[in-house]
Amino acid sequence: MLDGFVPWPDHLADEYRRRGIWLGRPLGDLLHDSCRRHADRVAVVCDGHRMTYAELSRRADRLAGGLIGLGIRPLDRVVVHLPNIPEFVVLVFALLRAGAIPVLALPGHRKSEISHLCAHSGAVAYAVKDEFGGFDYRELAREIPPVRHVLVSGDAQEFTALESVGGDDVPLPRVDPSDPALFLLSGGTTGLPKLIPRAHDDYAYVMRATAEAMHVGEEVAYLAVNPVAHQAALACPGVFGSLLLGGKAVLTSSVRPDEVFPLIRREHVTVTTVVPSVLRLWADSGQRPDLSHLLVQVGSAPLDPALARRAGEVLGCRIMRWYGISEGLLTHTRFDDPEDVIMGTDGRPMSRDDEVRIVDESLNPVPEGEAGEMIARGPYTIRGYYRAPEENTRSFTPDGFFRTGDLVRRSPEGDITIVGRIKDVINRAGEKVSAEEVERQLRTHPSVQDAAVVGVPDTVLGERTYAFLVLTGAQIRTSAVKEFLRGCGLATYKIPDRIVPLDQLPRTPMGKVDKKTLRALAVSSAR
């Protein structure tokens, strides 16, 4: 057992295995089995290059042998800092086979985050691309505190070339499926990311259950446009869930319609995952591709129902709304849900074994239909962050529920609607303002492409409300925006005190709106 990892209680782990929720097999073995069953099929496509399952298995096992030869042992941590390229898939597969733990960093992470991840995880190795997106990751490797091995895909210079690491016929270790398979990162906008340990048992279940929810099998062709280090593109069913099924994973780092639409048609893509801003980009492209074969999962940020309807009409695709946290819980709409549920809610929990409660500040259930914090536990929601006892005391209840921090309402039918964040409530003159509620209304204005609302300290009101807007092109007067919000029925105290146009909203490496930066901008503009 890895020191600092919080496992599920033994009685629950036994029950999950007895009922077949957990298979009791490590992910590396499950992927290896899929490679044997589908040896001649195409597994991975990227930039015109195609890799079969047989080649994927051969490369992964040879790399696993090489990693073992470098002294990397079971439960050792390796920070993987690669973009959407085949080497990402091969390396993660190899680490799973070797029993080591990938720590999945995002392409946008830099010295602060990577130094923290290496130190906090106790990483023995750091894997990067030589250059990507105009950035030299080797220079970053020189700046962080030393690790035992730096592995570089491409021109390694003084480091170890990832492609040179290999070992044939190296015995692979036995891997305990209850151990962590990989570390995801928390997606908060304050502080450095926390490490989220996902066990082999629970993550294999996520891949199977999300595929079942979307009614996909071995014919699935999944397009990863989000970084594969994100949970959705990784495993919902994502790249690795598709590989477990025998399907095809198509990798790209572009969201441009003129590049993505031909790729979708050429590779007969059936599923992809996007954030609402990308869906808007596609819907506003002026193209009307026939994507009737495509299911688009939309999540990670609020989705305007009008945008969802328009995207479905313009692109011809099916829309499925998802809510998900890297810590576990997933909710989604169903194909047979009424249109208002699909377009206007975040659906119901994925698993019948998810336990979800909506509670007040004292953790007491709120009346049906009222907003409260969503807390959850179940067979794929973690029991604690890695090496974070103080944070675990704050984020988990004594009986094992994870406190999501999300403010939600639940309908009588069980559908969840995210209305904001517990910490994203502005206290203006004693009145509570949900930033999410105001943002949602602002996005319905025809001249507003995106919006973010923050509160900043004020000596008179306690907090003053700032709304940052990304416009579609036409300028709009502040008074017109406020009048529009009044017309939407918002209470007067919810109308933003200040409206600031921006070319784009700042975002964290996890892709979330960076409200810390926006608050600093608001404070500086108020001086």
From Swiss-Prot:
PROSITE patterns: AMP_BINDING. This is Triostin synthetase I. The gene is trsA. Keywords: Antibiotic biosynthesis, ATP-binding, Ligase, Nucleotide-binding. ATP binds at residues 187-188, 300-302, 406, 421, 512. Belongs to the ATP-dependent AMP-binding enzyme family. It comes from Streptomyces triostinicus. InterPro entries: AMP-bd_C, AMP-bd_C_sf, AMP-binding_CS, AMP-dep_synth/lig_dom, ANL_N_sf, ATP-dep_AMP-bd_enzyme. Monomer. GO terms for molecular function: acid-thiol ligase activity; ATP binding. Optimum pH is 7.0-9.0. Involved in triostin biosynthesis. Activates quinoxaline-2-carboxylic acid (QA) via catalysis of the ATP-pyrophosphate exchange reaction dependent on QA, and the formation of the corresponding adenylate. Also activates structural analogs of QA such as quinoline-2-carboxylic acid and thieno[3,2-b]pyridine-5-carboxylic acid, but not quinoline-3-carboxylic acid, quinoline-4-carboxylic acid, pyridine-2-carboxylic acid or 2-pyrazinecarboxylic acid. Its EC number is 6.3.2.-. It is an enzyme of class 6 (ligase). GO terms for biological process: antibiotic biosynthetic process. The lineage of its organism: Bacteria, Bacillati, Actinomycetota, Actinomycetes, Kitasatosporales. Substrate binds at residues 230-231, 512.
